[in-house]
Amino acid sequence: MGKVYKKVELVGTSEEGLEAAIQAALARARKTLRHLDWFEVKEIRGTIGEAGVKEYQVVLEVGFRLEET
């Protein structure tokens, strides 16, 4: 039998950079979701402060495998 996946959308943020924003979103997802298998970056944006980039924001679609019943 094939596997079934569910997708959720998350937004990770970081003042450090894009990779840190992705890692923040995935770290939080791991606390409540099991069987995380993949992610896709859907959107990249940020906020601007007086000195330049204030915060990076990455919208992710995360796929996780549903458990068989």
From Swiss-Prot:
Changing R45A: No effect on the orientation of the bound flavin. Keywords: FAD, Flavoprotein, FMN, Nucleotide-binding. CoA binds at K6, R28, T32, L33, R34, R65, L66, E67. GO terms for molecular function: nucleotide binding. It comes from the Bacteria. Pfam families: Dodecin (PF07311). FMN binds at K3, V4, Y5, D37, W38, R45, Q57, R65. InterPro entries: Dodecin, Dodecin-like, Dodecin-like_sf, Dodecin_bact. The record marks R65 as: May be important for ligand binding specificity and FMN binding. Belongs to the dodecin family. May function as storage protein that sequesters various flavins and other cofactors, thereby protecting the cell against undesirable reactions mediated by the free cofactors. Binds and sequesters FMN, FAD, lumiflavin and lumichrome, and can also bind coenzyme A. NCBIfam families: DodecBact (NF043052). Homododecamer; four homotrimers assemble to form a dodecameric hollow sphere with an outer diameter of about 60 Angstroms. Flavin dimers are bound between subunits with a stoichiometry of 6 flavin dimers per dodecamer. Besides, trimeric coenzyme A molecules can be bound between subunits. A dodecamer can bind simultaneously 12 flavin and 12 coenzyme A molecules. This is Dodecin. It comes from Thermus thermophilus (strain ATCC 27634 / DSM 579 / HB8).
